[in-house]
Design a protein with these regions (language model features):
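ATP-dependent carboxylate activation and anion-phosphoryl transfer catalytic cores
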Residues: 4-235
Length: 235
């Protein structure tokens, strides 16, 4: 279990309770103490690196809208960051990847609150939400992943990366709309949206039976707009 201490006076009791609970449950009273963030955003940075020390970042994504600690809507750029913050965290991330000697695509995830970034983890792969980065940069991340894995050099530097407009992704899940419990079954009618600056990634079709064995996500709706408001209207 976890305990929150919002002041020094609350720490001794919370610490004792956490130790006692850990001891009773796991026969060890060791506990881990870290800073508690009241209302953070979930912000992640997309990086791309080749095998020759060349690294670029492709901007950030805001993945704060979640249910059951799972992302449901993502957008780029993050509306909470300014250009200075974006440039600063971008340099930190690319410098770190160079020092690590990392190669291929990767995503570095942070919690962000009150102007400060707190590292969570790095995913050494593409993310579900990578299409919105493709929308605003014009870079095909799947293609680049294959190229650098095959030993190719990056064809551009950070100065060549330009961000245009705003993009959002909405995950479509086969779930009960009230309980969010996975809801497998036959799709009686499927009509995917389309049009300018609209993309749907899915394998669904009318008559398809959604199986009960996998994740409930069955489609991704990705939209682009010149502004955030335009993007929201299209979504």
């Amino acid at each position: 279990g976890m305990r929150i201490a919002r002041g020094a006076d609350e720490l001794p009791e919370a610490y004792a309770q956490a130790r006692a609970e850990a001891k009773a449950s796991f026969t060890s009273d060791e506990v881990y103490i870290e800073k508690y963030l009241e209302n953070p955003r979930h912000v992640e940075m997309q990086v791309l690196a080749d095998k020759y020390g060349n690294v670029v970042h492709l901007g950030e994504r805001d993945c704060s809208m979640q249910r059951k600690n799972q992302k449901v809507l993502e957008e780029t750029p993050c509306p909470a960051l300014n250009d200075e913050q974006r440039k600063k965290i971008g340099k930190i991330v690319t410098d770190a990847m160079k020092k690590l000697g990392y190669s291929n695509v990767g995503t570095i995830e942070f919690l962000y609150e009150n102007g400060q970034f707190y590292f969570i983890e790095m995913n050494t792969r593409l993310q579900v939400e990578h299409p919105i980065t493709e929308m605003v940069t014009g870079i095909d991340l799947v293609r680049e992943q294959i190229r650098v894995a095959a030993g190719a050099h990056l064809n551009y530097t950070q100065d060549d990366i330009h961000f245009d407009g705003h993009a959002m992704e909405c995950r479509i899940n086969a779930e009960d709309p009230f309980t969010f419990v996975p809801w497998p079954g036959k799709i009686t009618q499927w009509h995917a949206p389309g049009g300018l600056w609209t993309r749907v990634d899915s394998g669904m079709y009318t008559g398809y039976t959604v199986p009960p064995y996998y994740d409930s996500m069955i489609a991704k709706l990705i939209v682009f707009g010149k502004t955030r408001n335009g993007c929201l209207m299209r979504l």
